[in-house]
């Protein structure tokens, strides 16, 4: 008895690969030919396997909640129409049907109270899968059957054969056509070489013959054109960029190596700057603790004195209330004014709000569909099948309505009545008490109705606001009218200046000046004092000019000399002595610090303070007032004018002043080793070299500083003017192009003008030549006509003779 092969069953990995390769070769229409490669599958099964599992457009991810809700609603609207439902959801029909049955089975388990985590659609041992085309492929066994190996080798051979009978026939026809064309071409060439032209017979084509005509051809207008751009320029091939590493791009290993190198450098810099964080990072701690910043709290709103006053008032009200209770006064006025404020009002239970109970809409819809599926015939009558309340809100995703938070309504002296603290109140809603919530602050005990409940108030309506103001004003007026008449009249009379003093005292008592303002005012006072003190100092100190580090007292002349000093010499000695005293005072109180040692320690200055103090004790320094200094300055100015007139000194020009200054400055030399100035003619060669080296170093420092400053300014100007520069370059290029066009147009204009002149001069000559040629041709034609007539006559004569 022959072996009967029943096609079908579980798909294997080898069969899936053969099916995909066959679809790539034969397409999605020749399923019989594709099935001939698979001995155990039919054409229908191959087609189902492709469209239900192997197609790359099939979605195989987990079902989302929105897709499940959409599936249940569409199944309710279009039952059993899975081919229509599938493209709406984005799944296959088999997937939709399978998941729908899965949801129904899950709902049935829920009704039967069988809470199991297993899939209800899972096959039990011994069951056969009715739809193997929608399941993943089974791995291939290590030892295949002979039939499977034969099928695999046959499929490999057939799929690898791309030259079938039809392909060979097409190739042969193509070769014959090419040989026929070459033979005809060779024949035409040989005939053309023999002097015989054969016109090629072309079949008349409908439409445009693209081999003979140029479609959409636009012939250029007659004239002269620039053909410089049409010249072919050979490309300068850069063979360095055609290397393999340039074509392949940067390798991943090279990029990772560069990144690792950057990380090492970054870690090295981090170790130098921030060692603790680098240690934490290298030890494997990814999230190390940050440095805690200093806690900055706002200033207290209530001072200690005010707090003590509140405590005293509370104690006084408590004593008054106890006195009223002991005396037996229990009227409404006393109970209202003297209310209890010690015990916290716990009218609202301290309960944590529980999570609102939510319902599983997918489970409800599945239960409804299962109940509608199992409903009895309506001929029996009775009640309808009980269903859960549902709607079509699950077709689209649900969005939560967000209310705008209102910080104005969350003030500490207002308790909202609708339980929505900090949200915009909705008009027209019923106020609800705050239930099942833990209060966020101490509830207000407002026995005097100072803060009335206004949760229902609509403050956006101006008419309502005006009405509330009018009612409160009327209520206040009625309350004031109800007050008892005063028993005693008092009149307080203030003195005339008491109001101003009272206002000033109130301002001084209430206003507390800020610490920053106090510091700023003190700093301004100190700056003013410093400026005033600086004005009383010497001009050299005020302008921070270089001053000598040592005082040369040998410039003074001895008093007991022969011959004795004159009055002018004595005056000069007094001036020198005062100058030496001023130098000692400045070196003691205002030592000079060179610009290079501003931040560091001053070297060689201020070390002889004891010497200066001793000298100033014997020769005290006298300070003068501002008026005395002004008088002395006026006297000096007058003396300078007298000397200028007496010496006939005119106005000195800047060139002459600079020349004199350069000559004087060239005679002075600074010795860096001794930190002093001396005359150039008294210095040695070594001192001159050291001085010049110091000057060169200073000049280089100035050059470096100015270069850095210039670089910063250049960078800043480049940022500011970069756009303008690029715009200017673009405009300059456009301007140059326009000038070139103008010159070219001018050159063409001159060329055409010259051409017109030549043509105007040549046209008459051409006309004369043409007229002569025509006249000559006419005469020749007449001669030929006469000759033709003679020949005809001679012909007739000969005919008549013979």
Curated annotation (Swiss-Prot):
Changing residue 53 to G: Abolishes DNA-binding. Changing residue 404 to A: Abolishes phosphorylation. No effect on homodimerization nor on nuclear localization. Residues 108-143, 247-278, 408-443 are annotated as: Disordered. Keywords: Activator, Cell cycle, Chromosomal rearrangement, Coiled coil, Cytoplasm, DNA damage, DNA repair, DNA-binding, Isopeptide bond, mRNA processing, mRNA splicing, Nucleus, Phosphoprotein, Repeat, RNA-binding, Spliceosome, Transcription, Transcription regulation, Ubl conjugation. Ubiquitously expressed in both fetal and adult tissues. The modification Phosphothreonine is found at residues 227, 377, 385, 396, 404, 411, 415, 424, 430, 438, 442. Changing residue 303 to A: Abolishes phosphorylation. No effect on homodimerization nor on nuclear localization. PROSITE patterns: HTH_MYB. Its main location: nucleus. Residues 1-56, 57-108 form the HTH myb-type domain. Residues 260-606 are annotated as: Interaction with PPP1R8. The record marks 414 as: Breakpoint for translocation. Residues 200-206 are annotated as: Required for interaction with CTNNBL1. Changing residue 82 to G: Abolishes DNA-binding. Residues 501-659 are annotated as: Interaction with DAPK3. One of its GO terms (molecular function) is DNA-binding transcription activator activity, RNA polymerase II-specific. Residues 31-54, 82-104 bind DNA. There is a cross-link at residues 135, 219, 487 (Glycyl lysine isopeptide (Lys-Gly) (interchain with G-Cter in SUMO2)). A motif (Nuclear localization signal) lies at residues 165-271. The keyword Membrane does not apply. GO terms for biological process: DNA damage checkpoint signaling; DNA repair; mRNA splicing, via spliceosome; positive regulation of transcription by RNA polymerase II; regulation of transcription by RNA polymerase II. DNA-binding protein involved in cell cycle control. May act as a transcription activator. Plays a role in pre-mRNA splicing as core component of precatalytic, catalytic and postcatalytic spliceosomal complexes. Component of the PRP19-CDC5L complex that forms an integral part of the spliceosome and is required for activating pre-mRNA splicing. The PRP19-CDC5L complex may also play a role in the response to DNA damage (DDR). As a component of the minor spliceosome, involved in the splicing of U12-type introns in pre-mRNAs. Belongs to the CEF1 family. This is Cell division cycle 5-like protein. It comes from Homo sapiens (Human). The gene is CDC5L.
């Amino acid at each position: 008895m022959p072996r009967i092969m029943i096609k079908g069953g579980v798909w294997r990995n080898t069969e899936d690969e053969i099916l995909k390769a066959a679809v790539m070769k034969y397409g999605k229409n020749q399923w019989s030919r594709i099935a001939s490669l698979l001995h155990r599958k039919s054409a229908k099964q191959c087609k189902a396997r492709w469209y239900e599992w192997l197609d790359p457009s099939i979605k195989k991810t987990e079902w989302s909640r929105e897709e499940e809700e959409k599936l249940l609603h569409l199944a309710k609207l279009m039952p059993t129409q899975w081919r229509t439902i599938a493209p709406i959801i984005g799944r296959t029909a088999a997937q939709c049907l399978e998941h729908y049955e899965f949801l129904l089975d899950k709902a049935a388990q829920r009704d039967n109270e069988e809470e199991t985590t297993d899939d209800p659609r899972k096959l039990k041992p011994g069951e056969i899968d009715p739809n193997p085309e929608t399941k993943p492929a089974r791995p291939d066994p290590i030892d295949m059957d002979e039939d499977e190996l034969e099928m695999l080798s046959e499929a490999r051979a057939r799929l690898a054969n791309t030259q079938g009978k039809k392909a060979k026939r097409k190739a042969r026809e193509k070769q014959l056509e090419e040989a026929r064309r070459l033979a005809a071409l060779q024949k035409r060439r040989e005939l053309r070489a023999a002097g015989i032209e054969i016109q090629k017979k072309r079949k008349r084509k409908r439409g445009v013959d693209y081999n003979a005509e140029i479609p959409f051809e636009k012939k250029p207008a007659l004239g002269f054109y620039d053909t410089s751009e049409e010249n072919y320029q050979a490309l300068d091939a850069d063979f360095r960029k055609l290397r393999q590493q340039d074509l392949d791009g940067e390798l991943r290993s090279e990029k990772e190596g560069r990144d690792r190198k950057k990380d090492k450098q970054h870690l090295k810099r981090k170790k130098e700057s921030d060692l603790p964080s680098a240690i934490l990072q290298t030890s494997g701690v990814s999230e190390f603790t940050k440095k805690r910043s200093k806690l900055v709290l706002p200033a207290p709103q209530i001072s200690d004195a005010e707090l003590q006053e509140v405590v005293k008032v509370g104690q006084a009200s408590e004593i008054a209330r106890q006195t009223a209770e002991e005396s037996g006064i229990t009227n409404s006025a006393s109970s209202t004014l003297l209310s209890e404020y010690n015990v916290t009002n716990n009218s609202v239970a301290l309960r944590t709000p529980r999570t609102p109970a939510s319902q599983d809409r997918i489970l409800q819809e599945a239960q409804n569909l299962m109940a509608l599926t199992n409903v009895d015939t309506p001929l029996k009558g009775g009640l309808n099948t009980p269903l859960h309340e549902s709607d079509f809100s699950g077709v689209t995703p649900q969005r939560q309505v967000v209310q705008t938070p209102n910080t104005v309504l969350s003030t500490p002296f207002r308790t909202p009545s609708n339980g929505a603290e900090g949200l915009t109140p909705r008009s027209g809603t019923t106020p609800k008490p705050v239930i099942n919530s833990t209060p966020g602050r101490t509830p207000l005990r407002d026995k005097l109705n100072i803060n009335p409940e206004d949760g229902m108030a609509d403050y956006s309506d101006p008419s309502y606001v005006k009405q509330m103001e009018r009612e409160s004003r009327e209520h206040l007026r009625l309350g004031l009218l109800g007050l008892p008449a005063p028993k005693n009249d008092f009149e307080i009379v203030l003195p005339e200046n008491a109001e101003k003093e009272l206002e000033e005292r109130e301002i001084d008592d209430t206003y507390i000046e800020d610490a920053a303002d106090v510091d700023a005012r003190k700093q301004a006072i100190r700056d003013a004092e410093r400026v005033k003190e600086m004005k009383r100092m010497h001009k050299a100190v005020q302008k921070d000019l270089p001053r000598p580090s040592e005082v040369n007292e040998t410039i003074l002349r001895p008093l007991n000399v022969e011959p004795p000093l004159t009055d002018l010499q004595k005056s000069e000695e007094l001036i020198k002595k005062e100058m030496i005293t001023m130098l000692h005072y400045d070196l003691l109180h205002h030592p000079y610090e060179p610009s290079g040692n501003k931040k560091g320690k001053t070297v060689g200055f201020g070390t002889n303070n004891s010497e200066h103090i001793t000298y100033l004790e014997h020769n005290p320094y006298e300070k003068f007032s501002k008026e005395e200094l002004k008088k002395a300055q006026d006297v000096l100015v007058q003396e300078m004018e007298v000397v200028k007139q007496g010496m006939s000194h005119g106005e000195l020009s800047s060139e002459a002043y600079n020349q004199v200054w350069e000559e004087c400055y060239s005679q002075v030399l600074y010795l860096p080793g001794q930190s002093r100035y001396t005359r150039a003619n008294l210095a040695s060669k070594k001192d001159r070299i050291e001085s010049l080296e110091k000057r060169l170093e200073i000049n280089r420092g100035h050059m470096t500083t100015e270069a850095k400053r210039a670089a910063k300014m250049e960078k800043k100007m480049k940022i500011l003017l970069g756009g303008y520069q690029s715009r200017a370059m673009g405009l300059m290029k456009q301007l140059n192009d326009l000038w070139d066009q103008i010159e070219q147009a001018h050159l063409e204009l001159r060329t055409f003008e010259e051409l017109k002149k030549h043509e105007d001069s040549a046209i008459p000559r051409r006309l004369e030549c043409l007229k002569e040629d025509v006249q000559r041709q006419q005469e020749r034609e007449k001669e030929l006509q006469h000759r033709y007539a003679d020949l005809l006559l001679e012909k007739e004569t000969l005919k008549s003779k013979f």
